[in-house]
Structures are given as C-alpha cells and as structure tokens.
Amino acid sequence: MPAAAGAAAAAAPAVDASVTPTPAGAVPIDGAAATGASVPAESAGATLVAGASTAPASAVAAPIEAPAAVAAAPADVTPAVGVSTTSASSKAASIDAVVVGATAAAAAAAVSSADTTPTPGAAPTPSIPAPTDASILAPADLDAAVTRATDALLAAQQPDGHWVYELEADSTIPAEYVLLVHYLGETPNLELERKIARYLRRVQLPGGGWPLFTDGAPDVSASVKAYFALKMIGDDADAEHMVRARNAIHAMGGAEMSNVFTRIQLALFGVVPWFAVPMMPVEIMLLPQWFPFHLSKVSYWARTVTVPLLVLNAKRPLAKNPRGVRVDELFVAPPVNAGLLPRAGHQSPAWFACFRVLDGLLRLTDGLFPRYTRERAIRQAVQFVDERLNGEDGLGAIYPAMANSVMMYAALGYPEDHPNRAIARRSLEKLLVIHDDETDEAYCQPCLSPVWDTSLAAHALLETGEPRAEAAAIRGLDWLRPLQILDVRGDWISRRPDVRPGGWAFQYANPHYPDVDDTAVVALAMDRVAKLANTDVYRDAIARAREWVVGMQSSDGGWGAFEPENTHHYLNSIPFSDHGALLDPPTADVSGRCLSMLAQLGETTGNSPPARFALDYLLAEQEPDGSWYGRWGMNYIYGTWSALGALNAAGLPFDDPRVKRAAQWLLSIQNPDGGWGEDGNSYKLDYRGYERATSTASQTAWALLGLMAAGEVEHPAVARGIAWLAAEQREHGLWDETRFTATGFPRVFYLRYHGYRKFFPLWALARYRNLRRSGTRRVTVGM
C-alpha cells in the first residue's frame, strides 16, 4: 500500500516496529547523481546493504537510454499522460502563465484566519490569499521543471529497470537492530554502531526524547529504546544528551509506561519481569479457525510478528548481553515491580475488562498446560515461520517479524550456522542504509519498497509524455511483470479459498502476502502502457491482477491492504494490542485505487457489481467536512486524493455534491505559501478537524492531483500550488522533504518514503501541464 505494504511492516511490532513489508537489496541513489548537480546530503553516498539485486552507485548514475524498439514507436501513438493530448506538436505549445504567491498583507491575513479553530465536522474556512502582485512562471520554466525532475528520476533507475528508495521510520528500528546484536551475543560492528549512534543523536528532540515523526511529541517507548541502544553502544549515561533523555523519559512517567513491544524487549534483557507482559500462550497455534483468537483473524503483519513472539513468551530466554548493560535508571519505581498497562484509549472498556480477566486466568493456569501440548504448539509455530521464511527477504519481509524469527531460532537452540537461522539473520542486513557521505550515519529500514517505488515512478514518468520517460517506465513494468505472484496461495485463502493468486507484493519477494494496493497501482500502470503502445503484452498480467483484487473485496465493498474481512475489532481490546494495530480493515485509500483500477479497465458502476459496491463504500466513508481518511499516507490529504481519483475514474460529474465538498475541503486547507501539509497529529483519537502543518512536496502534489481529478485545474489555488512546487525544486531536480508523510500504524508508527518527494511532484507538474495544453478538465486515467 503505498504504504499498504508499508503497513505490514510495523504492525505487529507495532509501536516500535516496522511497517511496510519489503525485502531486497539495492542502492538507493538520489536522482541527482547523474545530473552533475549536488546530491542532497540525506541520500548522497547512501548504500543499502543488500543482495544480488544491488547495483553499485556508478552503475546507476548514468541516464537511462530509451530502448530502440520503444523509442521508435509510431509517431501517432498518443502518450499515456492521463489526459487527451492533441498532437505531438502541441507538446511545444505554450501554456497559460502560472500565478505565483501573494502579497505579504494577503498572506498575513491568511495566516491570521488560519488560526481559527475549525468547527468539528465542518470544512475549515478558506484562508487562501488572493493572487495579487503576482510573479509569473513562464511556460518554459514549467517545462524545465518537468525536465529536471524527469532527469533525476531516470538517473535513479536501477540497471535492471526498477526503482528503490530509502524507507525511513523512527528511531525504534535502528535501536532495535543494535539491541538484537547484543541480545544474540554477536561481536558488534563498531563502525556501524558509531554511525547508528550518530543517527540516533541527530533525531533526538531538544527536550531529550525521541518522536514518532518529524517535530512530533516525544514518545516514551521510542525514547526508551533509543536510550538503551545508545547506552549499549557505549554512550556515557552521564553525557548531556543521555541525561536529557533520561529526564524526558521520567517526565513521561518512566519506562514503566512503555508499550507492550518495548516491555517484551526489556523482559528479554531481564530488566522487567515477564509479568509486565500480557499473556500470549503459544498454544494459540493449536486453536481451530472458528475460535475468536485464531491467527487468521488478525492482519498479516500481526501474524508474522506474533508467531515467533509466542515461542519467546513460552521459552522466556535471557539476552546474552555481553556488556551487561541495563537501563533500570529509566524507571520511576523499581522495574521489578512493573505491572500491566492500563486500558489504551482505543480499547473498549467492556472488552478490555473481559480480556484482562482472561489474562489473569491464563497466568494462573500457564504451568498447567501439558508439556506435550506446549511442545506441539511450538513445533507448529516453527513450521509456520519455516514455511514463510522467504529466503533473504525474510519472514513477512518486515523488520519486526524478521528479528523475532532470529530470536526464536536462537531460543530454541538452533546454532548460528543452521540454514534457517543463518538466512533469517542475513535478511536483516539487507535493511541497513549506511551513509558514507558527510552525514556519516546509518540506520535500519523497517522494510524495502521496490514494487511500490517502481510502479509509482512509472506513473509519474508516463504522465510526462516524453518518449525517453515512457521507455524507462516500460522497463520498470517489465521488471515488475515476473514478480507477479501466480503460484502461491497465501494466508488470504483462509477467507477466499477459491480465488486464484495474481497480486504483487510490496517488496522484492513476499509470496504469502501480496499487497492489494500495489497490485492495483501496477495494473493501472500496465494498462496505461498497453493503451499507449497498443500492445497486449501485459494483458494476462492485468487480467490476473484484476481477478485477484476483485477476490479480495470485502463484503462492505471496500478493500484492506492484504486480506478481506479482517474486521474483528474486539481483538484490538486485548491487553497485547495496546498499539491498536492488529487488524487490516477496508480503508478509503486502498479502496479508491481498486475502484480506479476497475474503472480504468472499462468497468462501470452500471455493468460491474464490484465497481458499484466500491463506489458505495467510498461515498459512505466520506467525512462530514468532505475529506477522506488516509490510512497509509498522511492523512486526509492522501485519502482525499485517493478517493477523488477514483470518483473521477468512475465518472462522477464535477458538480456532484460529494466531489465539490472534497474539492472545497482541499482548497480550504491550502497553506498561505501555496503548498499543503499535514502531520501525524491528525491521527489522534480526539481529532476534531484539520490542523495546519508545514507544506511538503509530496502532500502538495497529492492535493493538486486531487483537485485536478475534481476538475479544478483552472482554480487559482492550483496555480499557486504548482508555483510552490516549482519554487521549491532544487537544482538537482528534486525536492527536499525531511518530514514524515506516510503512515505505518496511526498513532504508533510513521514512515518517510524517500521516493515520495521525487515522483509525486513530477506527477503533479506534468499532469497540470497536460491538462492546460489539452484545454480539458477531465483526467482520463484512474490515478
């Protein structure tokens, strides 16, 4: 899912763990590498420690040449740019001037009005400055912006045709990696630890704690893990930054306020007793599918993370921890007295009370389970992991599950050179990003995102209409084609046993867990190329993708990220689910892309029941203020873009009240500088309406794409947004974006896709150019 995949990543390990699934190995190179321009510090010299698919930076730096067969395509082929273009010569035509900016007085007035608290459920009052005293963006400048961004994106394409960018989460994943090495008693790579320590210190807040997203509030669990990792690496507990961290943790109630996954980590190191961890007996593995707690009733990410944890809970091993590091000083009271956490805000009081009683009963009876039953349950858990180990791409292709599988094998006495333990351990190294540039840092990714990155980059390039860009997009899709999962019936068969496989995973390989969102986006791109080049080379792939996506539709008409009907909401009230991320219910963003796919493939709400049900679901999910919730991207801007693209593809007229309300909402939240922004605070349980945040390139692009899907290409606010993107573009052709704009698990785990600021702005600029040149308001593709 853009996230969708991203999703899986952090889930189970929730609060601190990762989010999106993806394994693999490649070298994320910033698009500027081949242009001769300066490369952003954050990605220059970054190396993904990965496997065979990794290419040396030098191999990626050269611009991609269009394959001769594609470059020589017939001149009368219409570029798949999302709108009807007129002729090849029209690409040289000038476009109307783009209005940029506003007077200082108008901007000040807008800022003043923006401070007004919005009425709950109502669209915020528009506060967009009028386009007075404007400067003009010449048509040639817009063309140049598209060209520079295209150059940068092409330069980042891997030799085999795909794209993969860094996927950054918060401090918890690199901290957990450090702790894992010492848990296993391995000899640490001191240079790597030094770089990770630099990263952890840099993302520490001035107040001492660590946040879940840029400029966010300190999070006690993230802070405990980061402090523990730094102390394990060798930072003096009396160092200024460590004292600040300790004080911040105490101010949040101490380490005893940590979430379940942090408590498990502390229990493994002997800091807290296992009593502080909710009971999760391994005998769960033996329950029948109809049972309320069967594993098929939770999400894929929760399943892959939890199964090895069940074994750890049964074995309760103690970390080797050769340096003997402890963090008792982070507790307000003695850690040995740590009890269970109270009910979380998302949990039902009644259900939680029932489950807390059950937790107590399980503690009383834990020693009474027959030994042979426990051993049988452990064997079943190991079998589950073995079957899904996924080679060097790892269990579930997400860090938490992969790390837990390594610890499980170690707890069961598997030697380091046992094939399963060894390959599980190697899979973690492929998630490392090591910067050898001036930043001199390293961190561990929650997963890898090559399928997501490649499919979205292809869409952006197709939008430009340039032959070289289209050729590169085709190379990317040709790389994707053999990755379609056609012969593995994954865990989704528990709900849809008669559906044939046909999806794509989020990562390089994850055959048991294809991703609905990725599959829809890949099929959309392949269909664009099929129409552009008048080819049927992707016909079978698209047909199987459509068949599988329709098979994954839930009974309410929507789609979850990985499986249908994953809506057993009572499970998020068990003590183990303080993170609230056990489930994968249908969401508007994923459902919007599935409807977009069906509509682009020619299905209408009149001739296709799946499309009709999807439209009904999407319209029912619209918020009172006109927006849609964004599960995998941050947040309502992302969800609203996803929904508007689908409504346009489904043929809703621009004057439909639902479309107009959504467009008005986007217009009303534009920042005075012309961009759009939103942060993780929008996921809080007491959210009452949009809260302004710093403009970002990716969110501005989403808002613009949404407005253009709503027929608002001529609106002055769109011109201001386009001008903002053009003004923020750097010499290397890309955009700077340090803020997190994606979501692994709301309120728990957020993501920063380094590719988002590269392909989404290009996509928006190119679409704007296409619509203005063609003189039409209607976008003719699904995304």
Where are the predicted features?
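Preference for long, amphipathic alpha-helical scaffolds in soluble/luminal domains
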Residues: 1-16, 20, 25, 30, ...
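Intrinsic disorder/low-complexity segments
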Residues: 6, 36, 40-47, 62, ...
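Alpha-helical polar/charged "hotspots" used for coordination or helix-helix interfaces
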Residues: 10-11, 15-16, 25, 31, ...
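Conserved positions within tandem-repeat grammars
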Residues: 21, 26-27, 41, 51-52, ...
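Intrinsic, low-complexity polybasic segments
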Residues: 46, 51-52, 62, 102, ...
